[in-house]
Amino acid sequence: MPSESFLKKIMGRDLQIMENDADMGPEYGDHADEPEIIADFTEYSPFHIGHRHCMMEAKRRVPEGLFVAVIPGPLERNGRGLPYMMTREARAAIAIRAGADIAVEGPPMGVMGSGQYSLCLAGMFRALDADWIPRGYRPIPGFEEVLRRINLGHRVVPRPHRIVDLDKGETLLKGPLEEDNYVITSLARALGKLGFDFRGKFIFVERIGGVSGTEIRRAVSDGDLQRVAGMLPPETMDVLSEEIEAGRAPLHDMRLEDEIIRNASEPGMDELMDLNLFDEVTASALIRGRPYMTLREVEEAIPPSFSRHHRQRILSVLEAKVHKGLVHKYIENYPSVIRILGFKDKQILKEFKDRIPHRRLEIWQ
């Protein structure tokens, strides 16, 4: 099990990265038109056979393309606000070994709302000048029409308990969406907001069965990797074993509990309201619930919200004490730098640098 000091070091470093990135603006310049860029946002927590299936299908359809894996991100918390199993460096290493050409850093999803991180991802696709965007989806009745409208370039957006085509003024689907499908519509909305023409750019790949991220994480927590070996490619098994041996994994059961308890217990109303994702209801509830002795007490004091991930995201915001102003500035300039977490070889790296319009690139050290 990694030490608390290891996690504290990551948090401190990543908060500084966010602050530095927020203070810079992106730079754009001339670029080559080829090869085509396949930009895939996937959290890889961990990379399983479903992820490999989506990657291989995209590479099959665009055999000469450069496959760029966009891997979140600073603070190492996922879109649901939960800790990742491995650092983004390790997740990038798996992606490259499994077939990606380039891996770049995505946004700090765990301390953002879905609308915020979707804007960041859309900004990254624009900065990469993405030709293709592969996305896995789960088939449900009526969703094929949603996908068709998106690939026509329509502004298809998620609303509470329904999906709406704004261009046609039609409700396409009613009821809550499964997470993978929700991300597709949220991303399409964000791309439209930024004026990115996504007509015909999505490669929609039906998810394969027999894979459970929850089961994988539970098996890793139990120290029984072999129980889920059929769900994981050998590249994931190898890197995960290396990370565990080095004391850098698993991270998905770890929180900086003392920081969360302190930041839930001490700040006044104004200071809490300055934290990202906090509203008056959440801040007031945390103040009423004091004092706190355990992480569970803090979690139970956080009121429910429209998003079922609200509690975990709030815990992640408290953990790193992430302020609204920082996040807003970060989103405004994102990506101020394309941070390269891994690459296949030097020739691929040169092709990538020549191809994308963003001129400020940094290789992760």
Swiss-Prot record:
InterPro entries: HIGH_NTase1_ass, Rossmann-like_a/b/a_fold, tRNA(Met)_cyd_acetate_ligase. Disulfide bonds: none annotated. Gene3D superfamilies: 1.20.58.620, HUPs (3.40.50.620). It holds the Pfam family HIGH_NTase1. Belongs to the TmcAL family. This is Uncharacterized protein MTH_1126.
